[in-house]
Amino acid sequence: RKDGSPFVTHPLAVAQIVAEELHLDSESIVAALLHDTIEDTEATHEQLAKLFSPTIADLVEGVSKLTRVHYTSKEEEQMENLRKMLMAMSKDIRVILIKISDRLHNMRTMEYQTPEKQKQKSFETMEIYAPIAHRLGMQKMKWELEDLSLKYLDPVGYREITEALDEKAAEYDGFMSAVHDRIVTRLREEGIEATVYGRMKHPYSIYRKMYTQNKSLDDVFDLFAFRVIVDTVADCYNVLGI
C-alpha cells in the first residue's frame, strides 16, 4: 500500500469495520477479507465458491462489480442515476455495505495518495457513497465519509472548523451537559422517562451552513443536536408539547 504497510492490512481493516461497526454476519466478514481477490488476483468466482461458499463468492464478485463502476459526470441527475445503479447492482444488501466499508477505510488512509487522487476519491465519496450510506440509515458512517471528503476537497475550510471546535471543546461540552440535564429534569417533572443524547454536529454539517449562508462559526447557532427517546408514541407527542 501507499503508506508502506502490507496489502493485507486493508482487507483486515475492512473486515474489522464490517464486524465491529456494522455487526454483520460471518459470511460478510469473510467476504470483506476477500473483497479484492477477484479484482486484484487471479482468483475466480468458482474457486472462491469451492474454497468458501457460493454465497461468499457472490458477495466478493458483487463488490468487484461495484469497484469497476466510476462516475463520469458531475451533473446531479447523473449522480442520482449512478447511486440507483449501485443499489440495483447490489442484489444482496451486504454487497453495498462491504463496499461502503471498503471506501471508508480507503478514505481513512487517503493522506498517502496524490492530491489529484485525494480530490477525485473525495468527490466520488461525497456525491455517491455518503448519500447511499444516508439512505441505508448509516448516519455515523455518512458523517465520517463527509468529513473525510471535506478534509481533501477544502483543506483550509476543514482545518478552520476543526481547530475552532477543538478550541471551544470545553465550553461546548459544558453547554451540552447543562442542556442535557435541563431536558432530563423537565421531562421528569412531567412524569416522562426518557433517554437523552446530545452531540456536536459534525464538521461538514457546520461547513455547509457557514459557506452556503456566508456565516462565521460564531454565527452558526445550531451546532448541537439532542435526541430524546421515549417508550410510547403518546410520550413522544407529550415531549413535543413541552
Regions found by a protein language model. Give the residues of each.
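Active-site helical microenvironments for divalent-metal-assisted chemistry
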Residues: 1-223, 230-242
